[in-house]
């Protein structure tokens, strides 16, 4: 067992969750700040911290009122302590620490990225150690080796932008607004529909792709992501086009992003051997990317685990899912203090 109250505030989502055994979500109220940040074209850290400060109390009250929790009822309190916006992290940490004291429960700090990778547990899956973890979000694009609970090692990282950041910046270039990922996907789907391309057959148009292949000559001894070149190519194509076909630009840009990600995953499987793959992070809400990853994993004959759509983006339930791995394996979390860095530590 393990009844947990969890807190998430690493960026622009304020989340509190009551989770049993790191798997069954009892309640998970969430406040999204997207509408608040949209006029600025991105996240304003100070505004994010203030919003967390305002929203944690009503979200927490919602859970406490509905479930009548008393001191001694919780097995632990979990909270994201890194990486993220330092002010936002501190708001969540102080809220969690106060609750841990009130409920007389231990506080377990969690790495935000390990929480994303643990989100598959909320859908009834166990984390299949050893495994590969593909993390794709607004701030991170990397592949990890999951050795055992509390032991995650970086296999390959991004040289510049993250995938989610590349999509957000592309949407800005094309005048589609924030957040960029869903906007790019919508316009790409519209273009495919206009050309009679059904899901799963997007490669039929690859000969028309106006963008260069990203890092076509990959190093064979390591995995690397890089999205700055394709972003620059999009800007040049947009500025030089006499007639700006936004749908076409979005479609071919998305195709190159997806191709780059899947080539890197394929490369990682060749290096590390056939291991189950856990793919996580907000970018995994992209249906085109999901289909491509499924194809690569079928080719290698390995299992692909992706969280449900609602658990792909930041939420507190995934924080409890990650903390449960420490709790049930009697491990001490190495993430007890708040930091902005994203380095993994061993338990």
Language-model segments: what does each one mean?
Residues 125, 148-189, 232, 236-242:
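Glycine-rich phosphate-binding loop plus the immediately following alpha-helix
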Residues 2-73, 79-83, 112, 116:
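N-terminal beta-alpha supersecondary unit
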Residues 116, 307-347:
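Glycine-rich phosphate-binding/hydrolytic loop that grips phosphoryl groups
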Residues 14-19, 133-135, 141-145:
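Short beta-strand scaffold segments in enzyme catalytic cores
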Residues 109-110, 294-319:
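Conserved phosphate-binding/catalytic loops in two-lobed NTP-binding clefts
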Residues 79-104, 287-295:
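Short Gly/Thr/Asp-enriched flexible loops that form oxyanion-binding sites at enzyme active sites
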Residues 187-193, 204-277, 286-300, 327-330, ...:
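A contiguous, well-structured pocket-lining segment that forms one wall/lid of small-molecule binding clefts
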Residues 1-2, 109-131, 322:
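Conserved phosphate-binding catalytic cores of ATP/NTP-utilizing and phosphoryl-transfer enzymes
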């Amino acid at each position: 067992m393990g009844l947990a109250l969890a807190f998430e505030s690493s960026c622009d989502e304020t989340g509190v969750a009551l989770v049993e055994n790191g798997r069954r979500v009892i309640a998970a109220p969430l406040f999204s700040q997207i509408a608040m940040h949209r006029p600025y074209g991105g996240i304003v850290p100070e505004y994010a911290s203030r919003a967390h400060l305002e929203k944690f109390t009503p979200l927490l009250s919602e859970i406490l009122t509905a479930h009548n929790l008393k001191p001694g009822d919780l097995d632990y309190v979990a909270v994201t302590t890194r990486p993220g916006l330092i002010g936002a992290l501190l708001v969540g940490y102080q809220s969690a620490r106060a609750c841990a004291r009130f409920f007389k429960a231990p506080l377990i700090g969690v790495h935000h990225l390990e929480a994303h990778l643990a989100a598959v547990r909320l859908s009834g899956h166990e984390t299949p150690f050893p495994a590969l973890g593909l993390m794709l979000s607004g701030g991170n694009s990397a592949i990890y080796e999951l050795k055992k609970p509390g032991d995650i090692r970086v296999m390959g990282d991004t040289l510049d932008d993250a995938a989610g950041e590349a999509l957000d910046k592309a949407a800005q270039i094309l005048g589609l607004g924030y957040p960029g990922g869903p906007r790019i996907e919508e316009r790409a789907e519209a273009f495919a529909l206009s050309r009679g391309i059904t899901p799963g057959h997007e490669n039929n148009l690859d000969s028309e792709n106006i963008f260069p292949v990203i890092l076509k000559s990959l190093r064979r001894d390591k995995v690397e992501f890089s999205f700055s070149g394709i972003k620059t190519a999009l800007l040049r194509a947009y500025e030089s086009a006499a007639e700006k076909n936004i749908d076409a630009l979005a479609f071919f840009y998305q195709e190159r992003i997806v191709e780059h990600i899947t080539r890197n995953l394929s490369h990682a499987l060749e290096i590390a051997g056939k291991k189950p793959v856990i793919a996580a992070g907000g970018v995994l809400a992209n249906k085109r990317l999901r289909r491509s990853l499924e194809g690569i994993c079928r080719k290698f004959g390995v299992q692909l685990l992706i969280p449900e759509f609602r658990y792909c983006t930041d939420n507190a339930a995934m924080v409890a899912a990650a903390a449960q791995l420490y709790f049930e394996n009697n491990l001490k979390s190495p993430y007890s203090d708040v930091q902005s860095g994203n380095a993994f530590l061993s338990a």
